[in-house]
Regions:
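Glycine-rich phosphate/pyrophosphate-binding loop and the adjoining helix
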Residues: 75-161
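Helix-loop-strand module that forms the ligand-binding subsite of alpha/beta enzymes
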Residues: 1-74
Length: 161
């Protein structure tokens, strides 16, 4: 059932706390479990938060490369929420005296990019099935081995002193 929901989506909002300078292990496990076949050729937005002053920015850096490897390309604008416990209530509403208008404007840049890219990617997927263009993309990338070149020992030179 979850796989069907993931496959049906045109884009994703990936939300993670910063956990030891990385994304949540639960999110990483979920992404690894379903792999690139469900997330590929669809955009994502990265939202991170932390109790500290950096808002999960270190987790976001790792998430960007992780999502890119899945073919789930993140939009350039990211959302970082420092001291999340002072900004958001458990139900997701803004706490007082937080300036909700400023935060909403901050979120809008990311979500506008995600909406635009999701629409563009959906139109392109409907026009051309990307898996027909690149069937190798459905394979597990870890099983792809690059061609091995045998070095010609005679062309190697070392400086000795």
């Amino acid at each position: 059932e979850l796989a069907d929901k993931i496959a049906a989506a045109d884009g994703y909002v990936m939300v993670s706390p910063e956990y030891n300078h990385s994304m949540s292990p639960a999110l990483a496990h979920l992404l690894n479990h379903f792999g690139s076949s469900l997330f590929s050729y669809k955009p994502s937005a990265i939202v991170t938060y932390s109790a500290g002053q950096w808002g999960g920015v270190r987790a976001a850096v790792g998430m960007r490369s992780f999502l890119s490897e899945l073919g789930c390309l993140p939009v350039s604008a990211m959302i970082h929420i420092p001291k999340a416990h002072e900004v958001l209530a458990e139900d997701g509403h803004f706490l007082e005296p937080v300036d909700a208008e400023k935060w909403t404007s901050y979120f809008a840049r990311t979500f506008t990019q995600l909406t635009w890219w999701a629409s563009a990617a959906q139109n392109q997927r409907n026009a051309i099935d990307p898996h027909k263009l690149a069937p190798a993309f459905k394979k597990d990338p870890r099983k792809e081995i690059p061609p091995q070149e045998t070095p010609n020992n005679s062309s190697l030179s070392f400086r000795t002193q």
